[in-house]
UniProtKB/Swiss-Prot annotation:
It comes from Pectobacterium atrosepticum (strain SCRI 1043 / ATCC BAA-672) (Erwinia carotovora subsp. atroseptica). Its EC number is 1.1.1.267. Keywords: Isoprene biosynthesis, Manganese, Metal-binding, NADP, Oxidoreductase. SUPFAM superfamilies: 1-deoxy-D-xylulose-5-phosphate reductoisomerase, C-terminal domain, Glyceraldehyde-3-phosphate dehydrogenase-like, C-terminal domain, NAD(P)-binding Rossmann-fold domains. Homodimer. GO terms for biological process: isopentenyl diphosphate biosynthetic process, methylerythritol 4-phosphate pathway involved in terpenoid biosynthetic process. Pfam families: DXP_redisom_C (PF08436), DXP_reductoisom (PF02670), DXPR_C (PF13288). The gene is dxr. Transmembrane segments: none annotated. Pathway: Isoprenoid biosynthesis; isopentenyl diphosphate biosynthesis via DXP pathway; isopentenyl diphosphate from 1-deoxy-D-xylulose 5-phosphate: step 1/6. Catalyzes the NADPH-dependent rearrangement and reduction of 1-deoxy-D-xylulose-5-phosphate (DXP) to 2-C-methyl-D-erythritol 4-phosphate (MEP). Its cofactor is Mg(2+); Mn(2+). One of its GO terms (molecular function) is NADPH binding. 1-deoxy-D-xylulose 5-phosphate binds at residues 125, 151-152, 186, 209, 222, 227-228, 231. This is 1-deoxy-D-xylulose 5-phosphate reductoisomerase.
Length: 398
């Protein structure tokens, strides 16, 4: 029986993770849950899974949860703040930590799990986008194990030899015959929208992903393909891949979740329904297999799989991310922070869809900070970029 802490339990990945746990009660149990401000859903989760601990982002949310749990006679101990999330990530007796807090807020709790030597199911892209080398060094030093949850990275992981799976971030791809990692993306809801019409796209249109069910921030990132850009950066770190060993292609059906091309001409791919329960169940049970509840693929119903090269005029955020990755950790941290501010403004209808890339590019162009050598450096760059992005928004506000 594996004991888990779920960081970000009320988000999309957290909810899917709990669904997999519920489907396999003989294999997994919840020790702790951590979330932001969604007291209503956290209450339901605590009553269903009876964790020993739960934490909320602030004291007001924690107090509200405490009072409601007391009414139901639930004995879950409720904590508050980032430090509480870090403590739950490092709890003795916890085998796995699902790191699913969206954004830079997930950085410190995820690192706490790494430093505690946990098996970390990594769904928080920002840990690698903002901390890269620092993060991978911490993994090596603490003897923690990373298992990727993003459907693309999980697909790549499954398509790689076991020797690389056991040495994520350090194994040589070429030594094991790997020629190229092929990252696939659907192209989002605006793949066929005229470029001239993109400025008029609304938040609701951007969040209507054709294949996946996701949170609103990640849905917008999918529409701009910034999501794929962040995944590109993450893949470079996770799989120790050079720019020459990476390729991004658009695959509208989202059936092939990513591929690995080998030296002998073979291409291994992982296919499945667009359901996050599949990679979650794979990582939770690794190296075994358990039921995820995901619908089986019907190849006859799919009919055809298609592919095309990304159009960088349509997806400038993807190009920005690739360029930032080649530039260094300061640039990727800056881009990630600026993008969070820009997307939040778009979701509140303060700026236009096409302004997201413009804001991101402007902030990147202001960057003169050196490469980070500590987490504090990363957090400083992150804070600086958010301030510059917020100032930049004033030029674009509708």
């Amino acid at each position: 029986m594996k004991q888990l802490t779920i960081l970000g339990s009320t988000g999309s990945i957290g909810v899917s993770s709990l669904a997999v746990i519920k489907a396999n009660p003989d294999k997994f149990t919840v020790r702790a849950l951590s979330a932001g401000y969604n007291v209503k859903l956290m209450l339901e989760q605590c009553l269903t899974f009876q964790p020993t601990y739960a934490s909320m982002a602030d004291e007001a949310s924690a107090t509200a949860l405490r009072q409601q749990l007391a009414e139901y006679g639930c004995k879950t101990e409720v904590l508050a703040g980032v430090q509480a999330a870090c403590e739950l990530a490092a709890l003795d007796g916890v085998d796995q930590v699902m790191a699913a807090i969206v954004g830079a807020a997930g950085l410190l709790p995820t690192l706490a799990a790494i430093h505690a030597g946990k098996q970390v199911l990594l769904a928080n892209k920002e840990s690698l986008v903002t901390c890269g080398r620092l993060f991978m060094d911490a993994v090596e030093q603490s003897d923690a194990q990373l298992l990727p949850i993003d459907s693309e990275h999980n697909a790549i992981f499954q398509s790689l030899p076991e020797q690389i799976q056991r040495q994520l971030g350090y194994a040589s791809l070429s030594k094991h015959g790997v020629e190229r990692i092929i990252l696939t993306g659907s192209g989002g809801p605006f793949r066929e929208t005229p470029v001239s019409a993109l400025a008029d796209m609304t938040p609701d249109q951007a969040c209507a992903h054709p294949n996946w069910s996701m949170g609103r921030k990640i849905s917008v990132d999918s529409a701009t393909m910034m999501n794929k850009g962040l995944e590109y950066i993450e893949a470079r770190w996770l799989f120790n891949a050079s720019a020459e060993q990476m390729e991004v292609i658009i695959h509208p059906q989202s059936v092939i979740h990513s591929m690995v091309r080998y030296r002998d001409g073979s291409v291994l791919a992982q296919l499945g329904s667009p359901d996050m329960r599949t990679p979650i169940a794979h990582a939770m049970a690794y190296p075994e297999r358990v039921a995820s509840g995901a619908k089986a693929l019907d190849f006859c119903q799919i009919g055809a799989l298609t592919f095309l090269a990304p159009d960088y005029a349509r997806y400038p955020c993807l190009q920005l991310a690739i360029d930032a990755c080649n530039h260094g950790q300061s640039a990727t941290t800056t881009l990630n922070a600026a993008n969070e501010i820009a997307v939040a403004a778009f979701l509140q209808s303060q700026i236009r869809f096409t302004d997201i890339a413009a804001v991101n590019q402007h902030v990147i162009e202001q960057l003169t900070l050196p490469e980070p050598t500590s987490v504090d450096d990363v957090l400083f760059i992150d804070s600086w970029a958010r301030q510059v992005a917020a100032q930049t928004l004033t030029h674009y506000v509708r």
